[in-house]
């Protein structure tokens, strides 16, 4: 469970920003997106392979320049 301590002397906006940052670090937003619908294991592997190829192409371009 994620919790943020709210200080009475600080504005609410700062506490809200800290909460959003903590949620981002914990990966809550990404996990919710992943759980919205089921993805088959084969589809996960295909996506991972596509991303690896894309990263390799980008690294090759950067190394070439």
UniProtKB/Swiss-Prot annotation:
One of its GO terms (biological process) is translation. GO terms for molecular function: structural constituent of ribosome. Keywords: Ribonucleoprotein, Ribosomal protein. One of its GO terms (cellular component) is ribosome. InterPro entries: Ribosomal_bS21, Ribosomal_bS21_sf. The keyword Ribosomal protein applies. The keyword Cell membrane does not apply. HAMAP family: Ribosomal_bS21 (MF_00358). Belongs to the bacterial ribosomal protein bS21 family. This is Small ribosomal subunit protein bS21A.
